[in-house]
Amino acid sequence: MGYTANDIRNICLLGHGGDGKSALCESMLFTTKAITRLGKRADGTTVSDFDDEEKKRQYSISSSVIPVEYSKCKINVIDNPGYFDFAGQIVQSLRVADAGLICLTAKSGIGVGTEKGWKYLQKAGLPAMFYISKLDEEHANFFNVLDSLREMFGASVIPFTFPILQGETAVGLVDLIEKKAFDANGKEIPLPADANDKIEEYMAELNEQVAETDEALMEKFFMEEPFTAEELQTGIKAGIRERSVTPVFCGCAYTGLGTTNLLANIVKYAPNPLEGKPMTQVDEEGNESEFKLDPNGSPMAFVFNTLADQYGKNSYFKVISGDMEDTLTVANVRTGDSEKLGNMFFPKGKDNTKTSKVCCGDIGVFTKLASVKTGDTLGLPGKTVRIKGMTYDEPMYKMAVYAKVKGTEDKIANGLVKLKEEDESFTYGNDPETKELIIAGVGDMQLSVLMAKLQSKYKVEAVLKPAKIAYRETIKKKVEIHGRHKKQSGGHGQFGDVYIRFEPQSESEEMIFADETVGGCVPKNFIPSVEKGLRNCVGKGVLAGYPVVFLKATLYFGSYHPVDSSDMAFQTAAGIAYKEGLPTAGPTLLEPIGELKVLIPDSNMGDVIGDLNKRRGRVMGMNPDPENPGYQIVEAEVPVGEMTSYSIDLRAMSQGRGSYTLKFVRYEEVPQMNQAKIIEDAKKEEEEA
C-alpha cells in the first residue's frame, strides 16, 4: 500500500550482542505475516543477518533495514550490530532514525550495550525506548531489570507493558495504558486482580511525567483531574520526543509474547519522520543550519549506508524532501555528477522489493549509482545544499596488512578501496617510513571481518601483523672524527678529507649542519657535498637502522686534491666520518611517546592505572567526566610501542565501557634494559629482508 510521512516510523534497534535484537525483528515479521516461519541465527535463517560472514560468525556486522507493516503504518526497523567494533553502522543508522529501541534481557539485565545504546541516543538527541526480552528464560526477572533501569536512567523510565507471571513463567502481559491483559497471540485475556495495584502505581508515575509536557496538563494534574485519552496520548508522544518519558516494553520473541503490543505502541506513540529531530544542512560556504523534512519540497535523499554484493553497490537512503521516483535524474551534491535512478527498491534484509516511488520519510535502496557513497546527498541538478555527513570516532586499533602471496599487494589495495565504500569507519594508508600498509579500526573483530571479506569477495588473502614502531636514534656525547676517502685506479682518482664534530642538539629533529672551516681547507663548492653525504646517512642509524634525530654535525677542517677531489668523493668521506663517529658518540634509541586520554568507569580506575604502570606509562592526571557521571578521564603519557594491544586490553578491563585516544607528542630515550631487544629484532628483520 502507499504511505505518507505520517505513516512511517523509523526505529533504530540497539543493545549488546545476544540481547535479542535480530530475534525481535523475526518476531515482528512473523507476527505481521511477512514471513511464514521464525528464522534462527544458529541456522543462518534470520532476515536481518544475511551476509555470509554474519552467518558464519553468528553475529551482526552491518545494519539491515526490516520494514514491518502494522495498523496501516510502516515501521522501518533498523537492526544494528551488537558488538561495538561495528559502531560505525550505529552512527549511520542514527542519522535516519526518529527513535531508538534498546534491547536487553530479563535474565542478564543492564549491560554495556544498554549503557552505550542510551548514550548514543542521548548524543543524537533521539527518543529512547527499552525492550526487555527473553521473558521465558530460566531466572528471568523483569521487575528486577526494570528497577535497575529506573535507578540508572531516572524517573522517565516507565513500563508500558509488564508480564503476568505464574511462578517464574510469563504467561501473558499487561498493557498499562489499555489496562488490559494479552496472551502470546495478542488476544485479550482476563486481567489478573493483582495487576491493578501495579497499574495504579505506574499510571501515577506516567501521569506525572506527562503533566510536565504541557502547562494545561500540569494544571489538571495538580487539580487531580484525570487526563482524557486524547490528552494522555498527546502528552505521551510529547514526552517521548522530549525524552521525559522512556517507555519499557517486554516480551519473548520466539513465543510472540508482547510483539503485537510493542508494534501497536510504536505506531501510537513513536514520532513519525515529520516529528523527528531536524537534520543539519551545509551550504557551499560551509555554513550549517537546521533542515526539516518537507513532503512538498523538491526531491532529496540522504545516503546513510552502502553494501556491495556480487551484483554491485546498494546505496541505502532516506527521502528527506518530496518523493523519490525511479524516472528522476538526480545530482550528487558532493561531486556534481548526475545519476539516473532507474532501479529503486524497498529493502528487507537481503531481499529488495522493486518500487517506482519512495515517499518522504521512508527508506529505500538505489543500485549501481557509481558516484554515490555513504553520507552523500542527492537532489535535483543544481542543488547546492547538502546534509552534513557522518562523523566517526578515530579508529585506534592499528595493524599492518601483508599479502599472504607476494605480488598480490595491488589486489589487496583495490579490495580495501571497495570495502571502504561499505565501512567508512576504518582507515588505511601506506606508512612512508616503515613501508607498511596500515589499517586502523575500532577493534580486532572489525579488522578480522575485513580480512575475511577480502578473501571471500575479492579473492585475495592478507594477514595482519603488529605495525612497526617508528623508533629513532640519537647520540648523547660530543665526538670529533676524521673521515678520509682516497682511491686511485688509473687516471683521475677520488679524494675527500673531512673532520666533523658530532654532538647532540635539542632545537630540531632534523640534523643541523654547520661549517666552521677557514682558509679554504675544504673548497666552498664541496661543503654542500659534505652536508649531502651526511643527510644521506642520517636516515639509517648505527644501532638498529632507525633515522637519527637531534644531531648537529659541524665541518671544522679538511683537505682536498686539486684534481682528484669531487662532489662524490666528499659525500663518501662524510659518510665514512658518520659511520665511524656515531658509534663512539653514545648512540641510543628513542621511542615515540603518546598523550593518552582514557575514559573509564570509576570502578575500573585501579585496573587501568595498574595496567598503565606495566606499560611504562606516567599518569598525569585524573578528573571526573562532566558529560558522563560515574566516569573518569585519565590522562597519561605512554610509549606508543607499549600500546599495540591496548584496544583489546581496555575492552577486557572495562567490559567494553572504556574508550581512549592516543596522540604522538615527542620522542624520549628508551630505557637501556629495553634497547637490546629492539635492536635485536631490527637486525633480525633486516637479515630476513
PLM segments and residue spans:
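Structural and coupling elements of P-loop NTPases
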Residues: 1-689
